[in-house]
Amino acid sequence: MRLAFSTLAFPAAPLATALSLGRSWGYDGVELRLIDGELIDPSMPAAARTAVRRAADAAGLPIMAVDSSIRLTGEEPEADLHRFLELASDWESPLVRVFGGTLAEEKPARQAQLGAAARVLAASVPAAERLGVRIGVETHDAFSASAVVAELLALVDSPWVGAVWDSHHPHRMGERPAEIQRNLAGRVLLAQVKDARRAPERDDGWQLVPLGEGEVPVREMLRQLLAGGYQNWISVEWEKRWHPEIADPETALPQHLELLRGWLAGLEEGAR
């Protein structure tokens, strides 16, 4: 499997610096969430788009995903999604990440929201297919449980729409990797990895930690993915932008890469 890193790890660095460092450590690709420390604006001018593409080419790193802030249950997600699909196509990226958003607790309202989100995705499929860019719904927010993402994907029968399996959020919801793999079988377009431990003193109850030092079963996640024939990217999502107290990328990203390579080598050898 090829290993990438998210630019969330670089909240202040120029994109060229982040790319150069990632390449020097041995990463194979980059997941774009921040550009020069800012969230991606899909309406960026052509010159800025070209500069991003040139920076990635110069570093020798493909842009394997473009991460949006789109929430499918939010306001007017379809227009923003089309802009992100076009942006990803410009960068020859195969994937746009989206969030599901919020869901009501009452069943009728919840079902209506799921239906509306499914219609947004279905309406975007022709553009996705034309541009050669898939849409991945992340296990996040009200869709943190893979069962909820699977419920949405069951309403959109298209190979151009799938899931982004974030290692942390389904674990928070009490799901184990084997269960997640069953729920998302055949539709995982990207696997994002991070580790965390319980931290009752924090508002969200969790603290991100170096890979292997928390309780998120990332190695088992990888085993399940390999057993299921997964051949897409593994991306390290070190969220320095959202959690400034965690280690700098110069420490965290090489550590993640070394451990992931070791785990994957062992799992692949054991599968032979």
Task: Name the predicted role of every residue range.
Residues A16-T17, L21, R54-P62, L72-A163, ...:
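Active-site acidic/histidine proton-transfer and metal-coordination neighborhood
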Residues E31, A65-D67, R97, G136, ...:
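Conserved beta-strand positions in the central sheet of alpha/beta enzyme cores
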Residues E31-R53, L103-E106:
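Glycine-rich, proline-tolerant flexible connector loops at the mouths of alpha/beta enzymes
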Residues L39-P42, Q111-A112, G205-P210:
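Short glycine-enriched, charge-decorated loop/helix-capping segments at active-site entrances
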